[in-house]
Amino acid sequence: MRTMVSDMESAPIPGCGIAVMAKASTPGCTKTRLVPPLTLDEAAQCNTAFLRDVADNILAASAQAPIAGYMAFGPPASKPFFQETLPREIGLIDAWYPNFGDCLLSSIVQLLERGHGSAVVLNSDSPTLPTSLLVETADMLARPGERVVLGPAHDGGYYLLGVKSARRRLFEDIAWSTEHVARQTLDRAAELELPVHILPRWYDVDDLRALKMLQAELFEDQSFALDLRPNRPQHTRVLMQALIENSDLQDRLTFNAFRRAAE
């Protein structure tokens, strides 16, 4: 398995490395499950806003815990997009494989090889994820002993997985992109006899229902979880506000919600 870590070579190594699994914003290739109600161009714009907000969220968490942020990206030719889009404090990791499990494992291996005591892979489409959950993850992984930290998503997947050593088995026999991912990952951890710390459930913005939840959090002050303070994603908020004001997005959201309900 190839490994390559780029940028930040002279930076100090905080205890916990967090790598966001990221794709460059290409219309027709990025966030296509949001089309409709979004157009292909709007979906790509959302991807860019999400990436910027997730990066900012990691940087905010790094002020409260020893955390360093990265983007695990592919293909390699997309590197300039991330260099131009993200804060310079965010490192870049090449993690491009046909199998998503290999992408995750490679990212973890590279973080640990860089010298981090723990490694976390994080999704790129939860811009309102509470910063406190990233801090909690780093704190749990800083404790003695092996463990897994898992952040389950509302759709049966997970938004975050943290470990202290690379265990290939955690990524084997997983039905990726299904509602079984989190449960199967817990099964793999049980096979390895690894204790698991489970974070509160959160949501991925990858379909109409989740897009409506995001809108409610941004503009209606409705939190996905009442006992958690969501991150306030400025880039996403500005983009969504502009799309609502300058296009018929609000009508499209309503129309598609009614259409899905009738199906």
What does each model-identified segment do?
Residues 129-155:
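Conserved donor-nucleotide/metal-binding helix-loop-beta segment in metal-dependent transferases, i.e.
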Residues 47-64:
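A short, N-terminal amphipathic alpha-helix
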Residues 81-118:
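Short phosphate-binding loop-to-helix
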Residues 168-186:
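Short, glycine-/small-residue-rich phosphate/pyrophosphate-handling segment
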Residues 1-34:
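N-terminal nucleotide-binding beta1-loop-alpha1 segment
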Residues 117-125:
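Short beta-strand-to-loop acidic/aromatic patch adjacent to the donor-nucleotide binding site
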Residues 67-75:
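Short beta-strand/loop segment that forms part of the nucleotide-sugar
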Residues 184-263:
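Conserved alpha/beta core of the MobA/IspD/sugar-nucleotide pyrophosphorylase nucleotidyltransferase superfamily
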